[in-house]
Regions:
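Glycine-rich phosphate/pyrophosphate-binding loop and the adjoining helix
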Residues: 121-170
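N-terminal beta-loop-helix "entrance" segment that forms/cooperates
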Residues: 23-40, 135-140
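N-terminal beta1-alpha1 ligand-phosphate binding loop
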Residues: 1-16
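Hydrophobic alpha-helical membrane-association signature
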Residues: 2-4, 41, 107, 155
């Protein structure tokens, strides 16, 4: 999803250190709460999220929700339970959802519920994009629609602002 690439690029331009996990990196085994030892790909995901002060999660609508691969990856974040900040505790999470029709709102709602369950803070702005709006983002993360670019700017400001504020509380 090029929307995630665009958001990651904008975060980097705002001064954030970024790591992007795409579809290939989410090819994980099914989540099991009783894994004796996490597979290497899961350890990498969990380790990067453990270091993160904020996240962006992007998803297409899959029949009123998100993809199984994304939900599975988010489930593995429970394995941060032993960390100083378990799950997504107090981390701002920007959300992006793209859909052919009105389903982007459903995907966004599903993402918000999952992020809340993990203790994260979904940003006030969650972006829903139609296929036409997604097409305004090229493979390099450039956004040709001023309206879409403005929304992304607000989302990035919210993630950076919440992460900054939290870092000054601890």
């Amino acid at each position: 999803m090029w929307a995630l690439g665009a958001a990651t690029r904008m975060l980097a331009q705002a001064g954030a250190e970024t790591v992007m996990f795409g579809v290939a990196e989410l090819d994980l085994p099914p989540y099991e709460p009783d894994f004796q030892e996490l597979p290497p790909a899961v350890r990498r995901l969990v380790g990067e999220v453990r270091r993160a002060d904020g996240l962006i999660v992007a998803a297409p609508d899959y029949l009123g929700g998100t993809s199984g691969a994304l939900k599975n990856a988010l489930d593995f974040l429970w394995d941060l339970g032993e960390a100083a900040r378990p799950g997504l505790d107090a981390r701002p999470v920007g959300l992006l959802a793209c859909a052919e029709g009105p389903g982007a709102g459903d995907a966004l709602s599903a993402l918000r519920a999952t992020v809340h369950a993990l203790g994260g803070w979904p940003t006030p702005l969650g972006i829903t994009l139609s296929r036409q709006e997604c097409a305004a983002i090229d493979q390099y993360g450039a956004i040709s629609s001023p309206g879409v670019a403005d929304q992304f700017g607000v989302l990035i400001d919210q993630i950076m602002g919440f992460a900054y504020a939290w870092s000054h509380l601890i």
